[in-house]
Structure formats: structure tokens, C-alpha cells
């Protein structure tokens, strides 16, 4: 019996330890890329889930690399006993004060804080977690996982330049808008002035058309007596045509210098006797008798009205 027990113990001692499998689910937030301004405080969270054993402990390590191609450097580590350790250049007092690793939620959430960011802090941050538990009086790693994020630090000069460029673009847009507004106002004012000028011109033109023109012509005296003839012409309103034509001044009809005289002299014909009218003697002494003879004119000149009649009056005194 003792021999069997010793053989079984030897076989168990020679049995291999359990292999480490990547069963942990590790994620880093914010990510995959996060931007911060120079001088701000950055916070990175490492979430852990899917542990294989409930009683296992976690060892968290943060690595830093300036780029994907560069070598990763261990920054800080939290052991399974929750002790924080700093490594390399990050163990110096200047950088050590700027790094803080805390366990927010036991076995699930870990926070890395980088205070007062500098341009040299820009790069890739990797969180690697290992699940450890005690197996046969030895600490054994059961699973592990990792996740990374990229942090970009924007310098103050670059941010100022970008803000200045944005303000410059906005001001340029408003300047263009102001110019367009001024042009639109000028066009509106000019159109109003032109409209008023057209209205005034039309009113003046209509007044000129509706005005009546009179022409007075004084005929020369006859050889036989004094005769005055007046001719008045009225310009009728003509309908407007498609195109405006020049107004021709109204020319009065031509009046001959002298009334036509018959070539032969006719003896004056006495008037028919009229009824005697008894008038006072004083009035009879001052009476003067006249003989009126109507003569047809020769062919009328072109343009002269045919309704014109010329008269010749001969005066004779009757001696009583």
C-alpha cells in the first residue's frame, strides 16, 4: 500500500502545470484615438471581464510606445497584492508625480491618470492584464489580455493658430456678405431712381400732347378798306404708335397777300330798295351806304382750306 501511495504522489508531482490561455477580455477607453490639449490631465480606463476563476487575482501593467514600430517600455505596474511599482524613466520623481494608477472597481476597472500633459506624452498606451491564482502552493497565471489606445497631445501654439485661422475664415465670410449686401442696396436705389425718372418723363410728355396750340394770322389790308382775317387751328390728339415719332409743328394755311381782284371793273350795283324806315334826321345825316360783292377765288392753293371766302367791300358816300 505504501508503494502505491508513493507511486501516485510521484505521478502527480510530474504532471504539467495548466497552460495560460488568453481568455480575459480587456478594453481601454477612450479609444482608439483620443486628443488632449497641452497642460490638461488625461485619464485612461482599463476594463477587465471574463475571468476564469472567481478567487483569482489580477496583475495590471501599462506600457508606453511613441509609435507602433517603436519598442514598448513598462511604465507602471499594479501587482496581485495591489502594490503600485514604477519602472524605467517613469520611476523618477518628476514623472512619478504625474502618473497615478488606481483600482476603481475590484478586479474589473483600473484607471491610469497622466497629469499636466506634455508633447512628449504623445504616443500609444497599452494595458496588459494577467489573471493569477494559487495552485498547489504556487502562483500560477491562468489567462491574460491586452488593449491599446493612441493619445495625441495638441500644443497651445497649434491650437491658437487653428483658432486664428477659423476666426479669419469666419471674418472673410462676413466681409463677403457685407459687400454683397451693399451691392444689392445700390442696385435697389438705382432702380427706384430710374422708375421715378420714367414716371416724370411720361407725365411731361402727356401734358405736351394734350396742350392746344393756337395760331393767329393777320391779313394785310385791302386796297379798298380795312379787313382782318383770323385763322385758328386745333391739333387733334393722335393715338400713340408702337414707336414714338417726332412731332411735326402745325403749319397754318398760307394766306394770300391780297385778295384776288377781278380783272374787269364792274359798275357798282345799287341795292334793292328797301322799306323806308323813319329815323331821326340827326341819324340820317351820318349814315353811309356800302355795296358788298362776293367773288369766287381762283383755284385754291394746295394745303389751303376750301371753305375760305374772300369779300371786297366798296364804300361810297351818298350826297344828300
Swiss-Prot record:
The chain crosses the membrane at residues 181-201. GO terms for cellular component: extracellular region; membrane; plasma membrane. Disulfide bonds join 46-127. InterPro entries: Ig-like_dom (IPR007110), Ig-like_dom_sf (IPR036179), Ig-like_fold (IPR013783), Ig_sub (IPR003599), Ig_V-set (IPR013106), IgSF_V-set/TM_domain (IPR051102). Residues 1-23 form the signal peptide. It is a single-pass type I membrane protein. It is found in: Cell membrane. PROSITE patterns: IG_LIKE. Proteolytically cleaved to generate a bioactive peptide. Residues 24-180 are extracellular. Residues 24-155 form the Ig-like domain. Keywords: Cell membrane, Disulfide bond, Glycoprotein, Immunoglobulin domain, Membrane, Secreted, Signal, Transmembrane, Transmembrane helix. GO terms for biological process: endothelial cell migration; endothelial cell proliferation; retina blood vessel maintenance; retina vasculature development in camera-type eye; sprouting angiogenesis; vasodilation. It holds the Pfam family V-set. Glycans are attached at residues 25, 41, 89, 144. Residues 202-320 are cytoplasmic. PANTHER family: V-SET AND TRANSMEMBRANE DOMAIN-CONTAINING PROTEIN, V-SET AND TRANSMEMBRANE DOMAIN-CONTAINING PROTEIN 4. Peptide Lv enhances L-type voltage-gated calcium channel (L-VGCC) currents in retinal photoreceptors. This is V-set and transmembrane domain-containing protein 4. It comes from Homo sapiens (Human).
